C-alpha cells in the first residue's frame, strides 16, 4: 500500500480550480487565488497539489497510529459521498446535520447512541408487548437517531482528525474541533477562511466531481494507514478476513 496518487489533470477535470464569483470571496484566500475568469475566481492548483498531498499524509499517519478520522459533509451533494467514503475506509461520518455539542458534549451524544443500540435490540427482536402504534413510534425514533448518529455510533469517543467539506456550512463542527484540539483537514473554497483550518486544501467545495475526488483520496489515504498499522503490528493484511477494498481513483473522477 502507498498514499494515493493524483494528477493536476484529474483536479482540472473535476473542476477543483473553480472558485466562487469574485464578489463573494474571502480576502484571506488571496494567496491561493491564481486569477479570475468571467468574474469567477480561479484557484491556484500549483498550491492545491502539495497541500492535498500533505493532508493525505496526515490522514494516513493518523490512522496508522490507531487514530480515528471523522468525515463531515452535510450539504446535499456531499452527503452520500461522505458516508460511502468513510464506510469504505472503516472511518466515521456525519452527513445529515451537525448537532451542537456533538464533540464537546460527547457524554450526552453517547447516551443517545446507547438509546439507538437499545432500539435496535428491541426492534430486531420480536418486539413483543408493543402495540402497532408503539412499535411505529419506536421505529421513527430509531430512524431519527440513526440519521443523526449512525455514522459515529461505533466511534467510541471523539476523533483524532476531522475531514470537512464546506467550512462555512460546518463552522460549528470546526469550532468544536478547535475547542477540543482536534486537528482539521478541510477543503477551502474562495469564500472560506483558511486561518481556521490546520491542513487546508484550496479547491472547489460545491462540484460533485470535485467532492467525490477529495473523498476518494482521503478514503484511500485512510486505507493506507490501516495497512501500515497492520503491517507494523505484524498482521498479514492479505490473510485478514476483511481486506479493505481500494476502488479505482478514476471512478471518483467520473462520478
UniProtKB/Swiss-Prot annotation:
One of its GO terms (molecular function) is structural constituent of ribosome. This is Small ribosomal subunit protein uS2. SUPFAM superfamilies: Ribosomal protein S2 (SSF52313). The lineage of its organism: Bacteria, Pseudomonadati, Pseudomonadota, Alphaproteobacteria, Hyphomicrobiales. Signal peptide: none annotated. The gene is rpsB. CDD domains: RPS2. The keyword Ribosomal protein applies. HAMAP family: Ribosomal_uS2_B (MF_00291_B). Belongs to the universal ribosomal protein uS2 family. GO terms for biological process: translation. It comes from Rhizobium leguminosarum bv. trifolii (strain WSM2304).
Amino acid at each position: 500500500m502507498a498514499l494515493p496518487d493524483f494528477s493536476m489533470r484529474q483536479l482540472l477535470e473535476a473542476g477543483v480550480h473553480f472558485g466562487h464569483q469574485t464578489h463573494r470571496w474571502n480576502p484571506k484566500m488571496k494567496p491561493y487565488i491564481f486569477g479570475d475568469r468571467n468574474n469567477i475566481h480561479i484557484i491556484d492548483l500549483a498550491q492545491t497539489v502539495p497541500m492535498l498531498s500533505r493532508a493525505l499524509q496526515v490522514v494516513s499517519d493518523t490512522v496508522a497510529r490507531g487514530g480515528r478520522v471523522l468525515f463531515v459533509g452535510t450539504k446535499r451533494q456531499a452527503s452520500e459521498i461522505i458516508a460511502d467514503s468513510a464506510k469504505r475506509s472503516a472511518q466515521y461520518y456525519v452527513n445529515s446535520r451537525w448537532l451542537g455539542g456533538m464533540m464537546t458534549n460527547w457524554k450526552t451524544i453517547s447516551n443517545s447512541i446507547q438509546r439507538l443500540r437499545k432500539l435496535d435490540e428491541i426492534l430486531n427482536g420480536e418486539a413483543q408487548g408493543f402495540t402497532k402504534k408503539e412499535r411505529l413510534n419506536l421505529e421513527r425514533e430509531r430512524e431519527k437517531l440513526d440519521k443523526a448518529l449512525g455514522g459515529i455510533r461505533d466511534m467510541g469517543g471523539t476523533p483524532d482528525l476531522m475531514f470537512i467539506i464546506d467550512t462555512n456550512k460546518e463552522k460549528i463542527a470546526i469550532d468544536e474541533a478547535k475547542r477540543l484540539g482536534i486537528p482539521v483537514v478541510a477543503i477551502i473554497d474562495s469564500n472560506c477562511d483558511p486561518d481556521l483550518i490546520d491542513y487546508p486544501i484550496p479547491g472547489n467545495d460545491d462540484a460533485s466531481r470535485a467532492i467525490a475526488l477529495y473523498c476518494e483520496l482521503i478514503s484511500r489515504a485512510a486505507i493506507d494507514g490501516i495497512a501500515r498499522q497492520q503491517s507494523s503490528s505484524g498482521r498479514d493484511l492479505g490473510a485478514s478476513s476483511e481486506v479493505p477494498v481500494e476502488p479505482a481513483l478514476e471512478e471518483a473522477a467520473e462520478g
